[in-house]
């Protein structure tokens, strides 16, 4: 075999090897490119999934806060309902208390014929007030106190040397409150005369 034919054969082998290598290289580059695309795709999917998780987490936190708010509001509503459920019933009892008050005012405790009636009505009134106080009903008797438009209703004003101006000089009808909430204002006569009484409002 001549040198030229050996050389030609070697060139042919070389070309085949180079062709094979370049085909393999192209195939590897193609696979690598596809793998890179797939990685980018997966990274995008992961980023989307993480964003959805954050969004869902945010929704869950908001929903939990809303549930807490609803629970708190419901508890407050139940507490208010329990506290003031007696309001209508208590309002119906006020005329009974007023009648007992009038019976005491119209009866002379010194008179032997009416003394027993007076004591009976007084005892009944005390028992009745004790019973309703257990449920938060308390009388408002502002005799001699400064006039308070939040708790008192002025029937009229009269000059008075005995009471300072804007002072309750006469209670026509007691007021009542239920758990510190006004049921009925006290009906009062307010003084016009004398020195003005200082109203001390503590903050």
Swiss-Prot record:
MF terms (GO), sorted A to Z: adenyl-nucleotide exchange factor activity; protein homodimerization activity; protein-folding chaperone binding; unfolded protein binding
Asked whether the keyword Transferase is assigned, the reply is no
- Record keywords: Chaperone, Cytoplasm, Stress response
Tell me which Gene3D superfamilies the record gives: 3.90.20.20, Head domain of nucleotide exchange factor GrpE
Q: Does the keyword Transferase apply?
A: no
Its BP terms in the Gene Ontology are: protein folding
Cite the residue spans of the region called Disordered. 1-20
SUPFAM superfamilies to which the protein is assigned, alphabetical: Coiled-coil domain of nucleotide exchange factor GrpE (SSF58014), Head domain of nucleotide exchange factor GrpE (SSF51064)
Compartment list: Cytoplasm
One short Pfam name that applies is GrpE
User: Where is the sequence biased in composition, kind Basic and acidic residues?
Assistant: 1-10
Q: Which GO cellular component terms are attached?
A: cytosol
As for what it does, the entry says: Participates actively in the response to hyperosmotic and heat shock by preventing the aggregation of stress-denatured proteins, in association with DnaK and GrpE. It is the nucleotide exchange factor for DnaK and may function as a thermosensor. Unfolded proteins bind initially to DnaJ; upon interaction with the DnaJ-bound protein, DnaK hydrolyzes its bound ATP, resulting in the formation of a stable complex. GrpE releases ADP from DnaK; ATP binding to DnaK triggers the release of the substrate protein, thus completing the reaction cycle.
Report the HAMAP family cross-referenced here: GrpE
The similarity annotation says: Belongs to the GrpE family.
What the entry lists under PANTHER family is as follows: GRPE PROTEIN (PTHR21237), GRPE PROTEIN HOMOLOG, MITOCHONDRIAL (PTHR21237:SF23)
What quaternary structure, including any partners, is listed in this protein's UniProt entry? Homodimer.
* The protein, known as: Protein GrpE
Taxonomic placement: Bacteria, Pseudomonadati, Pseudomonadota, Gammaproteobacteria, Alteromonadales
Which gene is this protein's source? grpE
